[in-house]
């Protein structure tokens, strides 16, 4: 098993992409091109990071650059856990009313990365989602289209690795979930637990779904995004019940990765789960 630092090093390289921010309803706010370079130094005992983001100038076709430079020799991030592919999640160790909650996620597949920052306001209502689509400099892998209902339909099986905030040993478990669509609605069956989903009406495209998970009595939404990505969050975090924050990425047809960050009913961070799945059986979507 790799150390946390060895997992960090899976992210070395020059990644070209953009930071795209949308509202909680998926409406666009901004799209900022970016280049981030992570280079190993001192025989990979440390990493030199340079992030450049290219912002438009008012009334001009020119752009100005905001640069961040950072050297680090321990895994960066707050309450962060890395996994063997280089995937990671970081965020607040405790969620409070009156303090913004920010959670970051990153998934990696070959020469591509899909990252996300979920931001909740002072009342713990989802404020915005920033997703970052990147590929290594020189890579030619095409970006995937926005997730569609048909991409989920079928039975997914895989392996989940769960790492804990209290540093107890990680565990691996098998996963199995089935997503089905009919003329009457959408249903997810996961480990023998059934969830019904509803599309939010009056949006330009069916990119936002809602469901209630009776295991933790929270109402969640699923926001569908470009490049095969999606976010699952409470529309508003209720600190009376446990909750989770999730990112998913269908990085190629029938293949996906997920990160699930869990909190208990007091708002304390408990664990991060990294799931790698493939589709076993494809169903039929009625759209």
Provide a role label for each language-model segment.
Residues 4-8, 19-284:
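Soluble ligand-binding/transfer domains with enclosed cavities or grooves
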